[in-house]
Amino acid sequence: MKNIAHIILDGNLTSDPEIKTLNSGKSVATFTLAVNHDYKSTLEEPGEVSFVEIELWDRQAVNAHEYLKKGKKATVIGELRQDRWKAQDGSNRSKLKVVGQMIRFDGLPGKKEREVA
């Protein structure tokens, strides 16, 4: 049986998306999404925030680079992936990221929302 690692995130960009075009001609964009959690231990205490790296490919990458900016709200549906590599000191390293399969851009000027599949 195949395992499922899908995730839905709704948050705000911490910076403008960075885009690269690979030798293969494919485009990849990356940005970090700040996702606020609703729970707080006290009214004075700020809520917890998670910072999640998002990776988009091809047309989604180009659209994100064109339409999304720091502070803008976005909803990402994607797959949770783990990058693994060996550091210069020989230690094994890893990090989690979300590879977006669908993204919704909220709050675009002149539009209520835009969905890119």
Swiss-Prot record:
GO terms for cellular component? nucleoid
Recall the GO molecular function terms of this protein's record: enzyme activator activity; single-stranded DNA binding
* Record has Methyltransferase as a keyword: no
Sorted keywords for this record are: DNA-binding
Q: Does the keyword DNA-binding apply?
A: yes
Q: Where's the SSB domain?
A: 1-107
Q: Name one GO biological process term.
A: DNA replication
InterPro entries found in the cross-reference section? NA-bd_OB-fold, Primosome_PriB/ssb, ssDNA-bd
How this chain assembles, per its entry, is:
Homotetramer.
Q: This chain belongs to which protein, by name?
A: Single-stranded DNA-binding protein
Q: What is the lineage of its organism?
A: Bacteria, Pseudomonadati, Spirochaetota, Spirochaetia, Leptospirales
Query: What gene does this protein come from?
Result: ssb
